[in-house]
Amino acid sequence: MKKIILATLAWTLMSAAQADNHSEPNYSKFQSNYYFSCPQPAACVGAFNQLMASPEIADKNFEVTLYALGHNGWDESTHMVSFYFKTAERYLEAGQTFSASPAFQEFTKAGASVGVENKAQTLTTHSIVSGDGRGTRSMVTWTVNVSDPATFVPAWQKLSKALENYPWASKAYGLQTLLLGNQGWATHQIWTAFDSPVEALNFLEKFYLTPEFQAYSAEVDGAVSLVRSYIANTVYEANPD
């Protein structure tokens, strides 16, 4: 498990560009994430598409992605919706908009009718981001519990930087801090973005075999532990930034 965690750190820090203007990615400050199970995926995707197309919501241009989850080793969640906010005020606006939306009420009814079950909610904030994830369709995520940030973060950054020259590196990565919803079992999430599941699997096959990862594993031993991991494939996206 530690190997997976360490590996995720390595590949994440491969592209070094900060968002200074709109020609570069404008990453969110806060991410509101909702995990759920859906036994009828086509119905759930259709209902979500209809919700986001409703006038009172579409006019707000909220940045949101609906993901299908694979190989989730933690619970029975099959999908995740992530809303991305640049400011706390935008987060508040979204809450007010959805709570007053008739379309959202219809969406919840539609979900209940096909057996949707809510599994978890988290609020995260980006601590580190790098690269350009716009247009990517697959994301590998590791949820981790960091007991020694002073050891973990520099080691992760060193590993990721060292892996930049590998041809199978991710297009972008981020380290998120869990603000709410962690239930005491995790402190951070690491994500890496790829153009396709094929690229994601190619990365997973190779990154933990590198000498850089082996050195990283030894360095962070006892400082971080893996909670869960999964691959998230985009099935709906609105207003990417």
What are the residue ranges of the model-derived segments?
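Short S/T/G/P-rich N-terminal loop/turn motif that feeds into the first structured element of a domain
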Residues: 19-215, 219-241
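Sec-dependent N-terminal signal peptides
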Residues: 4-13
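Sec/Tat signal peptide C-region and signal peptidase I cleavage site
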Residues: 13-19
